[in-house]
Structure formats: C-alpha cells, structure tokens
C-alpha cells in the first residue's frame, strides 16, 4: 500500500511535468490554428495516454513489484478508461445538443412561417374580397356629380337631366306668360311671382263669377215680368175683339188659349 502511494505521488509529479512541457510548447506555437493547448486539461485524451504509458513503464521497472500493485494498476487503468468513455459521451452529447436545438428551432420556425403564410394569405383574401364588394357597391350607387357637357355618368343621370330640361322649358313658358318675371331672376323668386299672379287671377275669376250670377238672376226676373205684360195685353186685345163682334151680331166661336 505504501508502494502504491509512492507510485501515485510519482505519477502526479510526472503528470505535472508533462503538463508544464505541453503548456510551454503551446506558448511557443500560438500561431498554429490546429493546436489549442491553452484550454488543455490533464484529463484530456493525450494526457491520459501519456500518463498510462508512463505508469506502465514505471510499474515494469519499479523494484518490488507485487500482485497487489498490479491489481491496483489495473483498477486505476479501468477507472481512467471509464472516465475517458464518460468524457467522450459527454462531448458527443454536447456536440449533438446544438444540432438538436437547431433542428427543433428550424422546425418551429418552419411551422411559424407556414402559419404566418396561411394567415397572410387569409388576410389578403379577405382584403381583396372586401375591396371587390366595395367596388360593386360603388357601381350600384347613383352618381350625383355633374357630368361634363355632352357626357353623362349613367342612365339615372340621363333621366334626371331630361326631367330638369322639361322643368326649365315649362318655367320659360311661365316667364313669358306671367308679367314681372325675368330671366335674370332666381328660381325661388320666379316661383313666388308666378304664385302671386295665379292667386290674383283666382280672385278675379271669383269676382267675375259672382257678378255673372247676379246678372243672370236679374235677367231672368225681367223676362218673367215681360211675359206677364204680354199676356195681359193679349187678353185685353181679345176682350176688345169679342166685344166688337158682339156688337156686330156675329157669333163668337173663338176660344182664348191664354191662361192666367
């Protein structure tokens, strides 16, 4: 056991010497990109191989080599090999982690891109549909703007223009018939003048109709008085004629057709 402790101390001293020599070599070759000994650790693969080789040589030449020491050496070497395997697996896992994370990130990004593309296409489709509906509504709406001379906006505007042309023609006829209307007047003023003129004509017609009614009733009364007078004169004439015939002695067969 004491021999093994001495061997362990010798191995540590040798490992430190090897590490110092490797560090010095790395300092001399800083410009070499293939060597990165600044982060070199005694537990790396090269150091372990050197340590094992030197340990085997020391065991072979060490006096008083015993089976116990050989067993200790085998256990130590197996421990170092297992540690080396663990380090390799850790390195592999660390190397695989960025790949897995990058693949997962790329998958998530692809899914996000697909979702964003679908959302964008849906929004674009809705926007185009809404724009088309707005254009259809604008086409169905009536255009109230004034068109240029000789042009028209749509059928409704054409019909409206024809209607306004007829109204203007009737207004010009009224201007010619109604005194006091001028072309320079506005539409409202001209309509007021026409209304006043029509009201005055209505009043005149009512007054004339009243006078005509009074005149007609007076004419009917005079005609009845004249008829009575004529009948009375005819009766008197007939009476005189009958008296004359009676004096002459001729019979009278004449019957009067007049009645009172």
UniProtKB/Swiss-Prot annotation:
SMART domains: HLH. Residues 151-201 form the bHLH domain. Positive regulator of brassinosteroid signaling. The keyword Transcription regulation applies. One of its GO terms (molecular function) is DNA binding. Induction: Induced by brassinosteroid, auxin, ethylene and cytokinin, and repressed by abscisic acid. Insensitive to gibberellic acid. Disruption phenotype: No visible phenotype. Redundant with BEE2 and BEE3. This is Transcription factor BEE 1. GO terms for cellular component: nucleus. PROSITE patterns: BHLH. Pfam families: HLH (PF00010). SUPFAM superfamilies: HLH, helix-loop-helix DNA-binding domain. Residues 118-139 are annotated as: Disordered. It is found in: Nucleus. Keywords: DNA-binding, Nucleus, Transcription, Transcription regulation. PANTHER family: STEROL REGULATORY ELEMENT-BINDING PROTEIN, TRANSCRIPTION FACTOR BEE 1. It comes from the Eukaryota. One of its GO terms (biological process) is regulation of DNA-templated transcription. The keyword Ribonucleoprotein does not apply. It comes from Arabidopsis thaliana (Mouse-ear cress).
């Amino acid at each position: 056991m004491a021999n093994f402790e001495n061997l362990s101390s010798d191995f540590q001293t040798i490992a430190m010497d090897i590490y110092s020599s490797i560090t010095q070599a790395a300092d001399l070759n800083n410009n070499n990109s293939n060597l990165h000994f600044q982060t070199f650790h005694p537990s790396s693969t090269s150091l372990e191989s050197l340590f094992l080789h030197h340990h085997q040589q020391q065991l072979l030449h060490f006096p008083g080599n015993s089976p116990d020491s050989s067993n200790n050496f085998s256990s130590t070497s197996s421990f170092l090999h297992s540690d080396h395997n663990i380090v390799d697996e850790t390195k592999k896992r660390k190397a695989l982690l960025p790949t897995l994370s990058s693949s997962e990130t790329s998958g998530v990004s692809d899914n996000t891109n697909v979702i964003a593309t679908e959302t964008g296409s849906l929004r674009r489709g809705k926007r185009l549909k809404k724009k088309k509906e707005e254009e259809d509504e604008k086409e169905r709406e009536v255009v109230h703007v004034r068109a240029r001379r000789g042009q028209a906006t749509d059928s409704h505007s054409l019909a409206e223009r024809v209607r306004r042309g007829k109204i203007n023609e009737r207004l010009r006829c009224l201007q010619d018939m109604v005194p006091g209307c001028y072309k320079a007047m506005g539409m409202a003023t001209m309509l007021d003048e026409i209304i006043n003129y029509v009201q005055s004509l209505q009043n005149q017609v009512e007054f004339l109709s009243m006078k005509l009614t009074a005149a007609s009733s007076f004419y009917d009364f005079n005609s009845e008085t004249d008829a009575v007078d004529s009948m009375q004169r005819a009766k008197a004439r007939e009476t005189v004629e009958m008296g004359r015939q009676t004096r002459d002695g001729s019979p009278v067969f004449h019957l009067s057709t007049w009645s009172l």
